[in-house]
Amino acid sequence: MSRSLKKGPFVDGYLLKKAETTRSSGRKEVIKMWSRRSTILPQFVGLTFGVHNGKKHVPVLVTEDMVGHKFGEFSPTRTYFGHTSDKKAKKG
């Protein structure tokens, strides 16, 4: 179920402040963040965010196609190593 239009998109307040200061300073730096639940807004386009995946910060460069999605969608939390093969079956 999607969020009510009356409420608007959710973005943590500190994230808006950090993005505004980074854009006004003109520096190209990665903005570290832990808020995977925040929605990507149009004013974030062109900025790079380090989205935490539980272990490290994954750099995500925001493009226009990402607007409206959540930051957590672009930083996977689980690593898939594939199913291990059965060594007994290979022998025989």
UniProtKB/Swiss-Prot annotation:
Pfam family, one: Ribosomal_S19
Keywords, comma-separated and alphabetical: Ribonucleoprotein, Ribosomal protein, RNA-binding, rRNA-binding
GO molecular function terms attached to this record: rRNA binding; structural constituent of ribosome
GO cellular component terms given for this protein: cytoplasm; small ribosomal subunit
Alphabetized InterPro entries for the sequence: Ribosomal_uS19 (IPR002222), Ribosomal_uS19_bac-type (IPR005732), Ribosomal_uS19_CS (IPR020934), Ribosomal_uS19_SF (IPR023575)
A Gene Ontology BP annotation from the UniProt entry: ribosomal small subunit assembly
Similarity comment text for this entry: Belongs to the universal ribosomal protein uS19 family.
Function: Protein S19 forms a complex with S13 that binds strongly to the 16S ribosomal RNA.
NCBIfam families, per the entry: rpsS_bact
Protein's name in the database: Small ribosomal subunit protein uS19
Native organism: Parvibaculum lavamentivorans (strain DS-1 / DSM 13023 / NCIMB 13966)
